[in-house]
Regions:
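Conserved Rossmann-like nucleotide-binding pocket used by diverse enzymes
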Residues: 31, 90, 198
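Conserved Radical SAM active-site core
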Residues: 7, 38-133
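Conserved AdoMet/S-adenosylmethionine-binding subsite of the radical SAM
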Residues: 96-240
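Generic marker of residues within folded, mature protein domains
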Residues: 20-22, 79, 189, 219
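Short aromatic/hydrophobic contact patches that present stacked aromatics
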Residues: 29, 86-88, 167-169
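Polyanion-binding catalytic cores of nucleic-acid enzymes and NTP/SAM-utilizing transferases
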Residues: 1
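N-terminal pre-triad scaffold of radical SAM enzymes
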Residues: 4-41
């Protein structure tokens, strides 16, 4: 078995979370390069493949860079009384490097960080390897209308493992079908009707109609307790 000692890192930076339940939260971001999918609406398509812009780093090198960026911005966290700064582990798809993350994430926890995993929720076996280190899991449901195939089985298994650590995000485009929204809500309800669902309309391309968003929201709300319609704020303010 090959031991993974380095992963391709596209960027490490400080910003504010721009989407989902934690919109506005100051975070450090660790963006890994490489993904197991190619979704039509992807807003970080530059990180799908491992390009020359990605640097292969060890866990110690990543920790050092994260600590450096945190120290540069720690006054932001202090002013907001945030004792445990949050790191968003994102991509690409970070769980393709689950074996590496098993070594990195404990080091980040030991250094006082809380961990926020952003994932396409298609690799439940990989999630099992790191779930105990994750504080929050932002999982995207991927629809056949955009990705060309369904992942309902994987999404349900992913939710079973994540349980109360997760919320679900669905990107809505003009191609999204009502049945995909209903199916998403039913899959979530099969685990817990209290898991939050974020309906996130695309604002770049294939923009959905307002009436469709209203219909999708109303149908999901019939099934789940917590449904929200939210756009990506970082795109409005043109920040990362």
């Amino acid at each position: 078995m090959t031991v993974v000692t380095k992963v391709p890192v596209y960027e490490i930076f400080f910003s504010f979370q721009g989407e989902g339940l934690y919109t506005g939260l100051p975070q450090l971001f660790l963006r890994l390069a490489g993904c197991n999918l190619q979704c039509g609406y992807c807003d970080t398509s530059y990180s799908i493949i491992v390009s020359k812009k990605a640097k292969c780093l060890t866990s110690d090198e990543i920790l050092k860079k994260l600590c450096f960026i945190y120290n540069k911005n720690k006054n932001v966290f202090k002013r907001l009384d945030i004792d445990r700064p949050s790191i968003s582990i994102t991509g690409g798809e970070p769980l393709i490097y689950a074996d590496f993350l098993k070594g990195l994430l404990p080091k980040l926890k030991e250094n006082g960080f809380s961990l926020y995993l952003e994932t396409n929720a298609t690799l439940p076996k990989n999630l099992k390897k790191v779930i105990k280190f994750c504080d929050v899991i932002s999982m995207d449901f991927k629809f056949p209308s955009e990705c060309g195939k369904s992942f309902w089985k994987e999404h349900k298994e992913f939710l079973k493992i994540s349980k109360n650590k997760a919320f679900v995000k669905c990107v809505i485009t003009k191609n999204t079908k009502l049945q995909e929204i209903i199916k998403s809500a039913e899959v979530i309800k099969s685990i817990s009707k209290n898991i939050s669902l974020i309906l996130q309309p695309s604002i770049d391309k294939n923009i959905p109609a307002i009436q469709d968003l209203y219909t999708f929201y109303c149908q999901a709300k019939k099934i789940l307790s917590n449904v929200y319609l939210m756009i990506q704020m970082h795109k409005i303010y043109n920040i990362r």
